[in-house]
A protein has these predicted regions:
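An acidic/polar, Gly/Ser/Thr-rich interaction patch typically located in mid-to-C-terminal regions
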Residues: 36-238
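Short beta-strand-centered interaction patches in the first periplasmic/extracellular domains
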Residues: 1-64
Length: 238
């Protein structure tokens, strides 16, 4: 459908995978990892699901997303059959919150373009996509139909992929060869405060998709390092 642009082609130890981002987000979490500096027992199985260390690599790089046209863009395509261009109204693309499934519970809120303005950053295009439509070029016969109309997916797939990379975390955990790139995991990080508290940090805790991972084995121990990503903040999305 028109609302499902954004597919990923990648390889894991199980072979090649081709999946939509929405399908990956709707997966059940395969494991829950907790960051704690307490190591209760060397034989406690809970230590297998402990985050040894982590670092937040990216946390909403707004300027980069504006440069890539993530939230709003203008498309300009040329039809070589009738020598017409798409109109400004036809080529306008705007980020729609309701069309996007997300890992976090918090809505993506964009700032206003100025303190006095009512419009937000998704109301003004920040990138222009240009191209030539494929009309009868790659068809075996004679056709006047547009083949793989880029105006229906190019801007949306760019939006979907870049929104997915809103928050990126690198972390190290005890070795787990059952994990795969593309799996969803739940991560729990304690909220930093002066007082003793078991409260979780809502800004970085929640569900993530494993973007990449590798396993390391040596006589001192076995570890899995990974990079995880998600598109929004909060514990649970939908």
């Amino acid at each position: 459908g028109d609302k499902t642009a954004g597919f990923l082609f990648y390889q894991t130890q199980d072979g090649f995978q081709f999946r939509s981002i929405d399908d990956m987000i709707e997966q059940e979490s395969v494991a829950t990892y907790v960051y704690t500096e307490v190591n209760k027992s060397s034989v406690d199985r809970n230590n297998d699901f402990r985050i040894i260390k982590y670092s937040v690599d990216k946390n909403q790089d707004l300027l980069k997303k504006l440069r890539l046209g993530t939230y709003s863009s203008q498309q300009l395509f040329f039809n070589p059959l009738n020598f017409r261009f798409t109109t400004p109204e036809q080529g306008k693309f705007k980020f729609q919150k309701s069309d996007v499934k997300k890992l976090g519970a918090r809505e993506i809120e964009l700032p206003k373009i100025s303190d006095e303005a009512e419009r937000t950053l998704d109301d003004l295009p920040t990138r222009i996509f240009t191209g030539i439509l494929d009309v009868g070029t790659l068809d075996r016969g004679i056709s006047r139909n547009v083949n793989a109309d880029a105006s229906k997916y190019q801007a949306q797939s760019t939006m979907r992929y870049n929104v997915l990379l809103t928050q990126t975390i690198s972390m190290l955990i005890p070795c787990n060869t059952d994990l795969r790139a593309g799996n969803v995991i739940t991560c729990e990080f304690p909220k930093i405060s002066r007082e003793d508290s078991s409260e979780l940090d809502p800004d970085i805790s929640g569900k993530y998709i494993i973007k990449e991972l590798c396993h390391h084995f040596d006589p001192e121990g076995s570890y899995t390092s990974m990079k995880i990503v998600r598109d929004s903040f909060g514990f649970y999305g939908g």
